[in-house]
Amino acid sequence: MAAAGLVTAFGHASYREDDAFHITPPKPLGSLQPDETLSRVSLEAEELPAGVPGEAWVHWAIYRNRPDVGGICRAQPQTATALASAGVPILPLHGQGAFLGREVPVFGDARLVRDRKTGERLAESLSDAGALVMRGNGAVAVGADVGLAAARMWVLEHSAGINQKAAAAGSPSPISEEEFAYWDSVSEEILGRIWAYLKS
Protein backbone atom coordinates (compact mmCIF):
# COMPACT_ATOMS: atom_id res chain seq x y z
CA MET A 1 0.00 0.00 0.00
CA ALA A 2 2.94 2.31 0.62
CA ALA A 3 4.16 1.89 -2.96
CA ALA A 4 0.65 2.71 -4.21
CA GLY A 5 0.60 5.92 -2.17
CA LEU A 6 -2.23 4.74 0.08
CA VAL A 7 -0.23 5.02 3.30
CA THR A 8 2.53 7.36 4.42
CA ALA A 9 3.42 7.68 8.11
CA PHE A 10 0.13 6.09 9.17
CA GLY A 11 -1.73 2.90 8.37
CA HIS A 12 -1.87 -0.69 9.55
CA ALA A 13 -2.95 -4.13 8.39
CA SER A 14 -4.00 -7.36 10.05
CA TYR A 15 -5.06 -10.92 9.36
CA ARG A 16 -7.34 -13.27 11.30
CA GLU A 17 -6.08 -16.51 12.82
CA ASP A 18 -8.65 -18.61 14.66
CA ASP A 19 -9.96 -16.56 17.61
CA ALA A 20 -7.38 -13.78 17.28
CA PHE A 21 -5.74 -11.49 14.76
CA HIS A 22 -2.18 -10.42 14.03
CA ILE A 23 -1.55 -6.71 13.40
CA THR A 24 1.37 -4.62 12.17
CA PRO A 25 3.24 -2.43 14.67
CA PRO A 26 2.61 1.34 14.99
CA LYS A 27 5.21 2.40 12.44
CA PRO A 28 5.10 3.31 8.72
CA LEU A 29 4.06 0.26 6.70
CA GLY A 30 6.65 1.06 4.05
CA SER A 31 9.40 0.60 6.63
CA LEU A 32 8.37 -2.93 7.66
CA GLN A 33 10.73 -5.80 6.92
CA PRO A 34 9.63 -9.30 5.78
CA ASP A 35 10.62 -10.76 9.16
CA GLU A 36 8.87 -8.03 11.17
CA THR A 37 7.15 -9.31 14.31
CA LEU A 38 3.38 -8.77 14.39
CA SER A 39 1.32 -8.54 17.56
CA ARG A 40 -1.40 -11.05 18.37
CA VAL A 41 -4.69 -9.73 19.75
CA SER A 42 -7.39 -12.04 21.08
CA LEU A 43 -10.95 -11.42 19.90
CA GLU A 44 -11.96 -11.90 23.53
CA ALA A 45 -9.57 -9.18 24.74
CA GLU A 46 -10.88 -6.58 27.16
CA GLU A 47 -7.78 -4.41 26.70
CA LEU A 48 -5.23 -4.09 23.92
CA PRO A 49 -1.78 -5.58 24.51
CA ALA A 50 1.21 -3.25 24.64
CA GLY A 51 2.88 -2.33 21.37
CA VAL A 52 -0.14 -2.42 19.07
CA PRO A 53 -1.68 0.53 17.20
CA GLY A 54 -4.30 2.32 19.29
CA GLU A 55 -6.76 1.80 16.46
CA ALA A 56 -6.46 -1.98 16.75
CA TRP A 57 -9.99 -1.67 18.17
CA VAL A 58 -11.12 -1.10 14.56
CA HIS A 59 -9.78 -4.53 13.58
CA TRP A 60 -11.04 -6.19 16.77
CA ALA A 61 -14.59 -4.96 16.25
CA ILE A 62 -14.76 -5.77 12.54
CA TYR A 63 -13.48 -9.32 13.00
CA ARG A 64 -16.04 -9.91 15.74
CA ASN A 65 -18.84 -8.47 13.60
CA ARG A 66 -17.83 -10.03 10.26
CA PRO A 67 -16.97 -13.76 10.27
CA ASP A 68 -16.31 -13.54 6.51
CA VAL A 69 -13.42 -11.09 6.96
CA GLY A 70 -9.92 -12.58 7.11
CA GLY A 71 -7.88 -9.42 6.54
CA ILE A 72 -8.18 -5.67 7.17
CA CYS A 73 -6.25 -2.67 5.87
CA ARG A 74 -6.34 0.82 7.35
CA ALA A 75 -4.99 3.59 5.11
CA GLN A 76 -5.19 7.26 4.14
CA PRO A 77 -6.58 7.42 0.58
CA GLN A 78 -6.73 11.13 -0.22
CA THR A 79 -9.49 11.26 -2.83
CA ALA A 80 -11.86 9.02 -0.87
CA THR A 81 -11.26 11.11 2.25
CA ALA A 82 -11.86 14.34 0.33
CA LEU A 83 -15.15 13.11 -1.16
CA ALA A 84 -16.43 12.07 2.27
CA SER A 85 -15.60 15.53 3.63
CA ALA A 86 -17.47 17.11 0.72
CA GLY A 87 -20.51 14.88 1.16
CA VAL A 88 -20.03 13.25 -2.26
CA PRO A 89 -21.04 9.56 -2.19
CA ILE A 90 -18.72 6.93 -3.65
CA LEU A 91 -20.95 4.83 -5.90
CA PRO A 92 -20.20 1.84 -8.17
CA LEU A 93 -19.77 3.78 -11.41
CA HIS A 94 -17.53 1.09 -12.91
CA GLY A 95 -17.41 -2.67 -12.49
CA GLN A 96 -14.75 -2.83 -9.80
CA GLY A 97 -16.70 -0.30 -7.76
CA ALA A 98 -19.11 -3.14 -6.95
CA PHE A 99 -16.38 -4.66 -4.77
CA LEU A 100 -17.04 -1.87 -2.25
CA GLY A 101 -20.83 -2.15 -1.97
CA ARG A 102 -23.74 -0.16 -3.40
CA GLU A 103 -22.48 2.99 -1.69
CA VAL A 104 -19.37 3.25 0.44
CA PRO A 105 -20.47 3.98 4.01
CA VAL A 106 -18.96 6.94 5.88
CA PHE A 107 -18.18 6.91 9.59
CA GLY A 108 -18.95 10.43 10.74
CA ASP A 109 -16.54 10.75 13.68
CA ALA A 110 -13.16 12.18 12.56
CA ARG A 111 -11.35 11.27 15.78
CA LEU A 112 -8.99 8.29 16.07
CA VAL A 113 -10.81 5.08 16.97
CA ARG A 114 -8.95 4.18 20.15
CA ASP A 115 -11.60 2.58 22.31
CA ARG A 116 -13.77 -0.50 22.10
CA LYS A 117 -17.13 1.26 21.94
CA THR A 118 -16.14 3.50 19.02
CA GLY A 119 -14.67 0.49 17.23
CA GLU A 120 -17.99 -1.30 17.60
CA ARG A 121 -19.86 1.70 16.20
CA LEU A 122 -17.51 1.76 13.22
CA ALA A 123 -18.03 -1.96 12.58
CA GLU A 124 -21.79 -1.41 12.63
CA SER A 125 -21.40 1.42 10.10
CA LEU A 126 -19.32 -0.83 7.84
CA SER A 127 -22.07 -3.48 7.98
CA ASP A 128 -21.55 -5.85 5.01
CA ALA A 129 -19.69 -3.36 2.77
CA GLY A 130 -16.18 -3.94 1.45
CA ALA A 131 -14.82 -0.61 2.65
CA LEU A 132 -15.68 2.38 4.78
CA VAL A 133 -14.42 5.96 4.74
CA MET A 134 -13.68 7.55 8.10
CA ARG A 135 -14.60 11.21 7.64
CA GLY A 136 -11.44 13.26 8.03
CA ASN A 137 -9.44 10.17 9.00
CA GLY A 138 -8.81 7.88 6.03
CA ALA A 139 -10.49 4.56 5.38
CA VAL A 140 -10.65 0.87 6.19
CA ALA A 141 -11.06 -2.00 3.72
CA VAL A 142 -11.73 -5.68 4.33
CA GLY A 143 -11.26 -8.94 2.47
CA ALA A 144 -11.14 -12.71 2.75
CA ASP A 145 -7.42 -12.25 3.41
CA VAL A 146 -5.13 -9.28 3.93
CA GLY A 147 -4.04 -9.22 0.28
CA LEU A 148 -7.62 -8.89 -0.93
CA ALA A 149 -8.22 -6.19 1.69
CA ALA A 150 -5.24 -4.22 0.34
CA ALA A 151 -6.54 -4.68 -3.19
CA ARG A 152 -9.95 -3.42 -2.11
CA MET A 153 -8.32 -0.33 -0.58
CA TRP A 154 -6.70 0.36 -3.96
CA VAL A 155 -10.11 -0.06 -5.63
CA LEU A 156 -11.62 2.38 -3.13
CA GLU A 157 -9.22 5.15 -4.06
CA HIS A 158 -9.49 4.38 -7.79
CA SER A 159 -13.29 4.40 -7.56
CA ALA A 160 -13.19 7.66 -5.61
CA GLY A 161 -11.22 9.23 -8.44
CA ILE A 162 -13.82 8.11 -10.98
CA ASN A 163 -16.63 9.46 -8.79
CA GLN A 164 -14.82 12.77 -8.39
CA LYS A 165 -14.46 13.21 -12.16
CA ALA A 166 -18.01 12.06 -12.87
CA ALA A 167 -19.49 14.43 -10.26
CA ALA A 168 -17.54 17.32 -11.77
CA ALA A 169 -18.72 16.47 -15.29
CA GLY A 170 -22.41 15.82 -14.65
CA SER A 171 -24.75 13.41 -12.87
CA PRO A 172 -23.02 10.08 -12.08
CA SER A 173 -25.01 6.96 -13.02
CA PRO A 174 -24.16 3.77 -11.09
CA ILE A 175 -23.98 0.41 -12.82
CA SER A 176 -27.24 -1.58 -12.94
CA GLU A 177 -28.31 -4.20 -10.39
CA GLU A 178 -27.59 -6.96 -12.92
CA GLU A 179 -24.14 -5.55 -13.65
CA PHE A 180 -23.48 -5.13 -9.93
CA ALA A 181 -24.33 -8.79 -9.28
CA TYR A 182 -22.04 -9.91 -12.10
CA TRP A 183 -19.06 -7.91 -10.85
CA ASP A 184 -19.69 -9.03 -7.28
CA SER A 185 -19.52 -12.65 -8.45
CA VAL A 186 -16.00 -12.19 -9.87
CA SER A 187 -14.68 -10.00 -7.06
CA GLU A 188 -12.14 -12.40 -5.56
CA GLU A 189 -10.69 -13.24 -8.98
CA ILE A 190 -10.21 -9.58 -9.91
CA LEU A 191 -9.04 -8.52 -6.45
CA GLY A 192 -6.47 -11.31 -6.56
CA ARG A 193 -5.08 -9.88 -9.79
CA ILE A 194 -4.98 -6.37 -8.29
CA TRP A 195 -3.08 -7.74 -5.29
CA ALA A 196 -0.57 -9.37 -7.64
CA TYR A 197 -0.17 -5.98 -9.36
CA LEU A 198 0.35 -4.20 -6.04
CA LYS A 199 3.07 -6.69 -5.09
CA SER A 200 4.90 -6.38 -8.42
PLM feature segments, named:
Residues 1-200:
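Glycine-rich flexible loops
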